[in-house]
UniProtKB/Swiss-Prot annotation:
UniProt keyword Transmembrane helix, yes or no: no
Pathway in which the depicted protein is active: Carbohydrate biosynthesis; 3-deoxy-D-manno-octulosonate biosynthesis; 3-deoxy-D-manno-octulosonate from D-ribulose 5-phosphate: step 2/3; Bacterial outer membrane biogenesis; lipopolysaccharide biosynthesis
Gene Ontology terms, MF aspect: 3-deoxy-8-phosphooctulonate synthase activity
Main location class: cytoplasm
Keywords from the UniProt entry: Cytoplasm, Lipopolysaccharide biosynthesis, Transferase
Protein's name in the database: 2-dehydro-3-deoxyphosphooctonate aldolase
Amino acid sequence: MFSDKMILIAGPCVIEEEETTLEIASRIQELVTPYADRIHWIFKSSYDKANRSSINSYRGPGLNEGLRILSKVKDTLGVEILTDVHSPEEARAAAKVCDILQIPAFLCRQTDLLVAAAETNAVINIKKGQFLSPWDMQGPVDKVLSTGNNKIILTERGCSFGYNNLVSDMRSIPVLSGMGFPVVFDGTHSVQLPGGLKTHSGGQTEFIPTLTRAALAAGAHGLFIETHANPAIAKSDAASMLSLKTFEALLPLWDQLYTCVRSFEMASV
């Protein structure tokens, strides 16, 4: 589905203004273009962050306006698009624009959502719930496969570890890989401190380089990275997003590590 290239799902957490979204997408494209023969970039952003900590938090422009902006990004840059969906109705609408439909971690066991998304024949990215063991993801996988759609990505995004904290168990990467689909590591949500700032989530972005290196070394097929020109003023997940400047600095490291691990795996066959 993605050949041997490293999968890189990258973009801002939530769609802000059209101009801002296009600027971020354009900058990411500039940064990844030199790696085009080795990295498969997919732009991501959400039209609705339905699980914000506070009722007063910005959720996004909504389904219709959000899909219009994502369509503009797709047409302008010629990039594949991923967004998350929350209901069967949203899945059917989003599939008209997006190449990949993402099942949010909190919704990864919702049968009707999984089946409806899969029936669109889009690629389905299932994020592992913070409350699930990696082997429990076989259930969501089977629900997608029941429709005849076998275009699946599995994303590891950390596991709940007490209150307001997540940990990443790298053993989950080979376990998930054993299900036969590409495994992506979410390097930004994995450093979240859910609800850690009372009305919004905190984060420890200083650990993103360490965790992303570990995930690639463990055999992950790619990374999921939320990035913004200025995370401090971002409208969602400001505490856990990576700045575009740091994203640029980490790209060659990710590329080299992924290439090294894949070369070693090929030599071991």
